[in-house]
Design a protein with these regions (language model features):
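N-terminal Rossmann-like or analogous alpha/beta NTP/dinucleotide-binding catalytic cores
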Residues: 2-135
């Protein structure tokens, strides 16, 4: 039997029972780093906090899908391209790999999915256009 999990709802400003949309399944989306430089303490803090949630859900027998994105196109990355002469791919691959090494050192569980912003630009543009049209 599963223990009832209670999570803080930051919108409602109160603790509420965790009620998954699908029984025994939990999907978590975490905004990951913008990969233009080495990881910092803020990246570690976020990773550790969501790793704790991941582990608690698994310990309570949930099938967990943990998704963390990489922002691999951004003004800071473009600035780094201009400063170094490296390609977008060279810079982002270097810092994604460095981030993953740091997370392994911290013993963070692996994510189920790690989408990159550059692979989802079309759907982002469509979403933005939908939001603009609702204005």
């Amino acid at each position: 039997m599963k223990k009832q999990l209670t999570l803080f709802d930051s919108v409602k400003k109160q603790k509420l029972p965790f009620e998954p949309q699908e029984q025994n399944k939990a999907s978590v989306y975490v905004c990951g780093p913008t990969v233009y430089d080495d990881s910092h303490l803020g990246h570690a803090r976020s990773a550790i906090a969501f790793d704790l949630l991941h582990r608690v859900l698994k310990a309570n027998n949930y099938n967990v899908t943990m998704t963390k994105n990489f922002t691999d196109i951004d003004d800071k990355i473009i600035k780094k391209i201009n400063e170094t002469g490296q390609t977008l791919e060279e810079i982002t691959t270097k810092y994604i790999n460095a981030y993953k090494n740091d997370m392994e050192t911290l013993n963070i569980l692996e994510n189920s999915q790690e989408p990159k912003a550059t692979k989802n630009l079309t759907s982002m543009i469509e979403m933005i256009n939908d939001l603009i049209s609702k204005d």
